[in-house]
Curated annotation (Swiss-Prot):
Keywords: Calcium, Disulfide bond, EGF-like domain, Glycoprotein, Neurodegeneration, Notch signaling pathway, Repeat, Secreted. InterPro entries: EGF-like_Ca-bd_dom, EGF-like_dom, EGF-type_Asp/Asn_hydroxyl_site, EGF_Ca-bd_CS, NOTCH1_EGF-like. Human-specific protein that promotes neural progenitor proliferation and evolutionary expansion of the brain neocortex by regulating the Notch signaling pathway. Able to promote neural progenitor self-renewal, possibly by down-regulating neuronal differentiation genes, thereby delaying the differentiation of neuronal progenitors and leading to an overall final increase in neuronal production. Acts by enhancing the Notch signaling pathway via two different mechanisms that probably work in parallel to reach the same effect. Interacts with NOTCH2. Interacts with DLL1; the interaction is direct. The keyword Disulfide bond applies. Its main location: secreted. GO terms for biological process: cerebral cortex development; Notch signaling pathway; positive regulation of Notch signaling pathway. This is Notch homolog 2 N-terminal-like protein C. It comes from the Eukaryota. Belongs to the NOTCH family.
Amino acid sequence: MWICPGGGGGGGGGGGGGDREDARPAPLCCGRCWRSGCAARPPRMCRDGYEPCVNEGMCVTYHNGTGYCKCPEGFLGEYCQHRDPCEKNRCQNGGTCVAQAMLGKATCRCASGFTGEDCQYSTSHPCFVSRPCLNGGTCHMLSRDTYECTCQVGFTGKECQWTDACLSHPCANGSTCTTVANQFSCKCLTGFTGQKCETDVNECDIPGHCQHGGTCLNLPGSYQCQCLQGFTGQYCDSLYVPCAPSPCVNGGTCRQTGDFTFECNCLPETVRRGTELWERDREVWNGKEHDEN
């Protein structure tokens, strides 16, 4: 029993290694490992029972003992193992598809005046003629006459013509920075102002935000109304009704006890759990932990 590297084995079967005279010797092998197995010399193509053609390729033998695989239409490669990449010619503008049979890949040989992977662009395209992208920018052809520049770090603009003034992050408080003609411009979030959006707007300077006698409290980028008793809402614009909506949690029922007061009637299980927590806290307070303090 012989074994070839890569799992090949058996006389005449598929195996590791390639049909090369410099194939490496393998342990437990009677000679060298070839594509067809282990033998003292390489098998002859389309002879010695070695017919490697796939995809209905036909083995053809020459008088000198060599052979090759004759591939059906749509396949190529040494063993017809690749689909013909030129079967559907992608080359445009009179370009010629050139297949690389061994790799199963193809390239386009473009007609004069055209370029691109598929010969889709004219050499009169601005990317070639005027080289519009400045400061090391890369020109990408979008169509026959349009392009887009990818700029190097530190530059911006349609043609990378401006120094990116936003690179130093000058805009504060979550504002958006844009560069126009080498200058930055900050678009501030609501509640902030200034060239760099560094100044908080004091909304409380403008009267009327809080209704029914509510007090305005300025906050960074916003404000809050502190309502008088009997009123609620963002602007103190709603009458306060203690149980609408109910403030009670865990299934408790709200009962209004006065104009501005209420009480929660809790479910028995909730009361029991609350009592257990209270008893545990009391034991901790009266026990060892309290004595150590």
